[in-house]
């Protein structure tokens, strides 16, 4: 859950609601609604969409936004493609190349309709000569044209509310970790927007340890949490024993 705050009642209520329990993000939904917040339900059958390719051009003081987005896409592809050994060097190179190509139109004319979606990356991978590119594209296919294509759309959700709850409990086993990673990237975009408005952002995440099991994804998660803190984000996980065991 994402909450920009300025010391108002919701901060106390959220802390009291969490108490000593392990809070599932969905458990916050009734509270968020009572506080006139926004609950965003993401599932294979929902009509709420988050585009994992969304790029905020003002997301870093010291690093290219495109480089940071490439790190995120590499982490996403590791969950989809990597297996036990993670992405291989050639696979990483191909993905990074295609990420930089897929944003050309948007960087030249940064309007919402030029923002790429996952299918644009998939099509670029198909155009590459290396057999590794075809392997990656085939692994992505189910998330683009198959039954798990919930993240192959332009974003259509409103995250301007002071309190936002992402409910991903219905994503299922195949999509849960991907959903967590995509939400984390969306929260990072919001942290940067709030920072520009001189606001802090409190972020509660359940089962964060699931993002620490793959090397690339763990590295990205650790790096993004450092950035959260630097940019005025206040991230909070659940049971510390799960994090230490991950």
PLM regions and their residue ranges:
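Short linear segments in intrinsically disordered or otherwise low-structure-confidence regions
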Residues: 17-18
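P-loop NTPase motor domains
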Residues: 26-37, 42-46, 51-233, 237
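A short beta-strand-to-loop transition that corresponds to the Sensor-1 phosphate-sensing loop
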Residues: 238-242
């Amino acid at each position: 859950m994402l909450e920009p705050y300025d010391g108002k009642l919701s901060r106390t209520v959220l802390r009291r609601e969490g108490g000593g329990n392990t809070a599932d993000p969905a458990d916050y939904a009734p509270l968020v609604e009572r506080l006139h917040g926004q609950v965003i339900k993401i599932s294979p059958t929902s009509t709420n969409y988050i585009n994992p390719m969304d790029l905020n051009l003002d997301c870093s003081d010291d690093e290219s936004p495109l480089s940071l987005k490439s790190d995120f896409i590499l982490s996403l592809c590791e969950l989809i493609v990597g297996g036990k050994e993670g992405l291989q060097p050639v696979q990483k190179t191909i993905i990074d190349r295609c990420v930089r190509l897929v944003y050309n139109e948007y960087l030249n004319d940064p309007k919402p309709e030029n923002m790429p979606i996952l299918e644009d990356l998939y099509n670029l991978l198909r155009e590459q000569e290396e057999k590794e590119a075809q392997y990656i594209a085939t692994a992505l296919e189910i998330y683009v044209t198959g039954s798990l294509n919930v993240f192959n759309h332009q974003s259509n959700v409103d995250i301007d509310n002071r309190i936002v709850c992402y409910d991903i409990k219905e994503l299922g086993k195949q999509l849960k970790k991907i959903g967590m990673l995509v939400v984390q990237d969306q929260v990072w975009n919001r942290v940067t927007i709030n920072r520009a408005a001189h606001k802090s952002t409190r972020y509660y995440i359940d089962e964060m340890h699931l993002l620490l099991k793959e090397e690339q994804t763990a590295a990205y998660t650790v790096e993004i949490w450092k950035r959260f803190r630097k940019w005025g984000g206040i991230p909070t996980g659940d049971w510390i024993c799960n994090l230490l065991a991950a």
